[in-house]
Amino acid sequence: MKGILVNYEFCTGCHSCEVACKKHLGLPEGEFGIKVSEIGPYEYEEQPRGSEKWEWTWVPALTKACTLCEDRTEKGKMPMCVQHCQAWCMAYGEIEDLIRHVDEKSRYMILTNRKR
């Protein structure tokens, strides 16, 4: 099974993935294949594990419109969101291979979608 690995610690919230996906799928206003949500900013009274005092994160999520760009990936290309990520914090591949890139130094998530 294939998916997208996101190191969301480095996502800048630029929305390039949203724009590229939306254009590729030809989605109307208000619909998305991938949607970046903002979490924060909020302040910790105590910094967990020596982290920053403030939390301000952007987290991408796939919607039901996402096809993982099957038309592109079948030709060996990357999904549009991965190709256009300005922070280079997204990777596409087999989930088993993506998991090997996960370490304890950063914050990751793996995004998948169901077959239609």
PLM feature spans:
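Non-ligating segments of multi-cofactor redox enzymes
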Residues: 1-116
